[in-house]
Regions:
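Bacterial N-terminal signal peptides
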Residues: 3-16
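Eukaryotic scaffold repeat domains enriched in small/polar residues
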Residues: 16-328
Length: 328
């Protein structure tokens, strides 16, 4: 089995970052390793791949991959074997995919302007938003990117490329509240690209084009802003409330103070505490070759972990999902 060894640098950097101040402790480091599992996934030759923005893992360690061609949803075991596939409407608008607390599958679609809830087998249960129509009112989205589902069933949608807001719905899909607007000030968004919730109900939003993560209460109160750690593309939260982030280094446009987001100059994964402390920094191999080699990524987008701590990463330009195994 071929593998690509990826050095992982643990950084004990205490970034306790509130809305107005940054506290920093001394920096220490240690080293661990991940390797790419070249046997994962095992996909039939006739199953095509396209841009692959989303990945999630259910309670049984089944891995759901969301790609922009049909069948858009591919479900794999940890050993790489393919369990099942199913199609969605407007697959070329696929974005992030999540598993709710009841085991149902939630999918954000930036083309159909919807958030949809499915059974694990692909039966449609609920649609939020009006398919094919963008808007900024209580019943519409404008390119919604992601959703966080609380144990209560409440739904928080990051909306998105067009509206730059977070929208709250109850478990039945009824509108409750919203907050956010376009901007760079605390509580504003340039692009709310991904969202997760911890076990205490705090919401973590990847404000990608502002190169920061913002933390909110479920009422929309701003709790913290984590600047200059990473340009965050995708988020994942573990059962013990560690926040995993995939993205790229923060960089400025040459000769300007503005941030440069695209194209990314590198590929990173970080593990953060609930206080914004960087617990782990994982530099990944980047390629600009559309084919790429195993272990390389090109516009990393989605991140998920299974119960054994294995990483599942997807990328846009690389058109694939990959598994990385942590080494002792």
């Amino acid at each position: 089995i071929s593998s690509v060894l990826i050095a992982v640098t643990f950084l004990a950097i205490a970034f306790t970052l509130g809305c107005e101040r940054l506290q920093r402790s001394e920096i220490g480091d240690a080293t661990a390793h991940y390797t790419v599992d070249a046997t994962w996934p095992q996909t039939p030759d006739d199953l095509a791949w396209d841009q692959t923005p989303g990945v999630t893992v259910d309670s049984e360690d089944n891995i759901y991959v969301f790609t922009r061609c049909d069948p858009a949803v591919r479900v794999y075991k940890t050993d790489g074997s393919l369990l099942r596939t199913w199609a969605v409407e407007d697959s070329n608008g696929a974005h992030f995919i999540r598993i709710g607390p009841a085991g149902n599958v939630w999918a954000a679609n930036i083309k159909s302007q919807t958030i949809r809830k499915y059974t694990p087998e692909g039966k449609l249960l609920l649609t939020l938003g009006e398919p094919g129509r963008a808007g900024a009112d209580q019943g519409h989205f404008d390119k919604p990117t992601d959703m966080a589902i609380l144990p209560s069933g409440d739904i928080f949608v990051s909306d998105g490329y067009g509206n730059r807001r977070i929208v709250h719905f109850d478990a039945t899909g009824k509108y409750v509240n919203e907050w956010g607007q376009t901007g760079t000030k605390p509580g504003q968004f340039a692009l709310p690209h991904s969202i997760v919730a911890d076990s205490h109900g705090r919401l973590y939003v990847a404000d990608r084009e502002n190169a920061r993560i913002q933390v909110f209460s479920t009422k929309g109160k701003l709790l913290a802003v984590w600047n200059n750690l990473i340009t965050p593309w995708g988020l994942w939260i573990s059962k013990n409330d560690d926040i995993w982030v995939c993205g790229s280094s923060v960089k400025k446009k040459e000769g300007e103070n503005a941030l440069a987001i695209l194209p990314p100059e590198d590929q990173l994964v970080m593990k953060l505490s609930r206080k914004g402390t960087v617990l782990l920094r994982v530099p990944l191999q980047m390629t600009t070759d559309p084919l790429g080699k195993q272990g390389e990524l090109n516009w990393i987008h989605g991140i998920a972990l299974d119960s054994q701590g294995n990483l599942y990463l997807t990328d846009i330009q690389g058109h694939r999902a990959q598994k990385f195994v942590r080494q002792p």
